[in-house]
Design a protein with these regions (language model features):
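A structural signal for well-ordered alpha-helices, especially hydrophobic packing surfaces
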Residues: 50, 54-57, 61, 81-88, ...
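Alpha-helical initiation/capping and key positions within long helical/coiled-coil segments
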Residues: 45, 72, 100, 208, ...
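Conserved amphipathic alpha-helical "coupling/scaffold" segments
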Residues: 1-151
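Charged, amphipathic alpha-helical linker segments immediately N-terminal to NTP-binding catalytic cores
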Residues: 215-261
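Conserved C-terminal helix/linker of AAA+ ATPases
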Residues: 97-101, 234-244, 478-485
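ATPase nucleotide-binding head domains, primarily ABC-like/P-loop NTPase cores
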Residues: 246-485
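Extended, charged alpha-helical coiled-coil/arm scaffolds that mediate oligomerization and mechanical coupling
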Residues: 128-218, 222
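Glycine- and acidic
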Residues: 62-63, 202-207, 283-287
Length: 485
């Protein structure tokens, strides 16, 4: 399950990332909107889902004409849940609903003519020749629907009588025309009555096939959804993830966050892709401010979540065991509606995660937790959290500025950040800082976002004071800083 509130889902960028998964049918869009999570006991189902998407990727690459044909059909499917439900409950459908069913049957027939696509998608669509015959008794092959004369000899006779009467009306005048109009009204009433009876009989004939039609429409949604996943994977350059055994380490090679990468690219900035391994227990991620910790956490969490949702994650290679839940918590909490402080909200979220983690292995991500309390107690709590999760079967990834001592089950990673020599170089070149935007751009350009493993006792490189001085922070502040030293 996903334990992510709406605000953190937005900050993680999950919904925005999945905008690249472009379903065309109402059925496919519903499947996407469900956020179907595959847990440890659904490994076989997830493996089948990922394999189908993988096969579709190859199909999409090599069969562009068939793909375009399939998309042309998918684009015309409508949401027929109410119509099909009414049919199964013996409700008499109106002409519009009958037209929609005929159109769906016709579209299904066309998809059946692309068997290679259905096979690669691992989708079964059952032929419906009985429905085709009932809805198109003249075998015209048209998409429109009409209550054909073949449905009722009485209806055909009434229509014929009306047609003859209308010819007479063309020449009639006065009282004669008025009498003919009265006759025509009677014929029209008879037609309407007979058409209602015909629709009732026709719906009774269609009703036995309602379940099969419903199954086919669900299959169309699955086809659409898997096809959208395959095309998204191609756009991202993503590969099929490997599913590992419980307790094995998560592996992410050259992973990235597509939304953030697109945003940076749009303003001419580069995004550095990263590689890491997240072992069972606690992983502590450190690094200076502006060093990219939050982006790194978002990107790695997004990849793990997407695997559990049946997508290919945005990485050159990814492998993960299946977790019972994935939880992501950023440093922002919408507390106004609950009447809780930021600290209280964080503790409640951490409490709930721990309750889950005691029962099932989870993947828990905390981005600088407990910033809202004093540093001494926060350091103690964060350190205790790290040690607590170290003994659990899941994974905790913790980004923090607080010290977390080394120990069994605790691993320390660091974003390299700005190297001292590089910082000194730009400060020497430009004694006076450039305009603010240019200064920030230069600092960002110096950042090394690669992830390295460090000894738990290694110092975190810092450049905050030098950067603050270079950016023109009032010298009086530094005088007080020197006094403290």
């Amino acid at each position: 399950m996903l334990l992510i509130n709406r605000q953190d889902r937005e900050r993680l960028g999950l919904s925005q990332a999945l905008e690249a998964c472009r379903c065309m049918t109402p059925q496919g869009k519903r499947l996407k909107a469900k956020y179907r999570y595959f847990g440890p006991d659904e490994r076989r189902l997830l493996k089948a889902e990922l394999s189908a998407v993988d096969q579709l990727i190859e199909y999409v690459k090599h069969h562009p004409l068939e793909l375009r044909n399939a998309q042309d059909q998918l684009a015309h499917f409508r949401d027929l849940r109410g119509t099909v439900a009414g049919l199964s409950k013996s409700r008499t459908l109106d002409l519009t609903e009958l037209f929609e069913i005929k159109q769906a049957v016709r579209l299904l027939h066309k998809l059946l003519k692309i068997p290679g696509l259905l096979a690669k998608a691992d989708i079964t669509i059952h032929p419906l020749p009985e429905l085709e015959a009932l809805l198109d008794p003249r075998e015209l092959g048209t998409s429109g629907f009409y209550l054909y004369d073949e449905y009722s000899s009485r209806l055909a006779a009434l229509r014929q009588s009306r047609a003859e009467l209308e010819k007479e009306m063309e020449k009639a005048q006065g009282e004669e025309r008025a009498a003919l109009l009265r006759q025509r009204s009677q014929l029209l009433a008879g037609e309407a009555e007979e058409e209602t009876a015909v629709r009732a009989v026709l719906c009774g004939q269609l009703a036995p096939f309602a379940d099969r039609l419903s199954d086919n429409l669900q299959a169309v949604g699955q086809l659409d959804f898997r096809l959208a996943k395959a095309q998204m994977a191609l756009r991202w350059g993503a590969s099929k993830p490997d599913l590992l055994e419980a307790g094995e380490a998560v592996i992410l090679e050259q992973f990235h966050h597509p939304v953030i990468e697109d945003h940076l690219s749009a303003r001419g900035a580069a995004y550095e892709r990263q590689t890491t391994t997240l072992a069972r227990g606690t992983t502590v991620l450190t690094g200076a401010n502006m060093g990219g910790k939050s982006v790194t956490l978002k990107a790695m969490t997004l990849s793990v979540i997407l695997i559990h949702l049946g997508y290919f994650p945005p990485a050159e290679y990814a492998a993960s065991p299946l977790f019972g839940f994935v939880s992501y918590s950023s440093d922002y909490f919408d507390t106004t509606k609950r009447g809780l402080s930021t600290f209280a909200s964080e503790v409640v979220k951490i409490r709930d995660d721990i309750r889950q983690a005691r029962q099932i292995p989870g993947f828990v991500v905390l981005d600088e937790p407990l910033r809202g309390t004093n540093p001494q107690e926060a350091t103690a709590l964060v350190g205790a959290l790290g040690r607590f999760y170290a003994s659990l079967p899941g994974v905790l990834v913790l980004a923090t500025h607080y010290e977390v001592p080394a120990g069994a089950g605790i691993r320390h990673l660091r974003l390299r950040g700005i190297q001292a020599g590089d910082l000194e170089e730009i400060m020497e070149i430009t004694k006076d800082p450039p305009p603010d935007e240019e200064a920030v751009r230069r600092i960002e350009a110096l950042m090394d976002y690669s992830i390295e493993t460090v000894d738990g006792s290694a110092a975190v490189p810092t450049a905050a004071i030098r950067i603050a001085r270079w950016l023109g922070l009032d010298s009086g502040v530094f005088e007080h800083l020197e006094e403290q030293e």
